[in-house]
A protein has these predicted regions:
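N-terminal beta-loop-helix "entrance" segment that forms/cooperates
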Residues: 43-56
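Catalytic nucleophile-elbow at a beta strand-turn-alpha helix junction centered on a G-D-S/GDSL motif
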Residues: 9-19
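C-terminal accessory helical subdomains adjacent to catalytic cores in phosphodiester-
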Residues: 1-5, 18-43, 59-205
Length: 205
């Protein structure tokens, strides 16, 4: 059980994730005296889309060093699987189960931070979103379409995509068919794009 008055820094890749955490996750946890602070990787005007391994390591290690002497302070991440760049995961294609892939990457992240900082293992709790934050939009395609009334005419196409997969997190065949690409190919008037994602992330939930 998480102790009261806990502080958790969440390193995110872009503005959409930050807005999602501030609007959806943060209020829920604060009622239990768990205080969430999202911080954008690299710099606050970073647009997201790519997470370089060295940047991840630098930012997380810096945060760990700042909090290491303080009780009830922790660091986690929220990175899209397809946002990862140059992570040392050469053998990951041999892993078929998507959740095993997630565990594989998170273990590399944890081991890297522990080797660099020698902090207590519980200080850093890595998290990778499979495959993207946009995958969660397929949890309720009717609610997604309600945000933009012109999108209702695409609801059958979106539902067919959802029905083809075990869960929204399974929606993926390749880089060109990841959730964001599927939304870009289906939704028009207005067209779905990265700016739309930032607007939708806080309100669709």
């Amino acid at each position: 059980m998480t102790p009261p008055n806990t502080h958790i820094f969440i390193v995110v890749e872009g503005q959409s994730e930050k807005e999602f955490i501030n609007t959806v996750i943060k209020p829920t946890f604060e009622s239990n005296q768990i205080y969430i602070c999202p911080t954008i990787l690299g710099r606050n005007n970073h647009k997201g889309g790519h997470v370089q391994f060295d940047r991840f390591k630098r930012d997380v290690v810096s945060l760990i060093k700042q909090i290491d002497k303080q009780n009830n302070f922790f660091v986690t991440t929220m990175f899209d699987f397809y946002g990862l760049e140059d992570f040392p995961v050469q053998d990951i294609e041999q892993v078929n189960n998507i959740y095993k892939k997630e565990e594989y990457i998170e273990k590399i992240m944890l081991d890297t931070v522990l080797q660099t900082t020698q902090c207590h293992p519980e200080r850093f709790i890595p998290y990778i979103q499979l495959y993207e934050l946009e995958g969660l939009f397929f949890s309720d395609v009717e609610k997604l379409c309600s945000i933009q009334p012109n999108w209702y005419k695409f609801i059958s196409q979106l539902q067919n995509i959802r029905n083809d997969f075990e869960t929204p997190e399974h929606i993926n065949n390749s880089f060109d068919t990841k959730p964001s690409k599927r939304l870009e190919n289906v939704l028009f008037s207005p067209k779905y794009n990265s700016k739309t994602k930032t607007l939708l992330s806080p309100i669709i939930w």
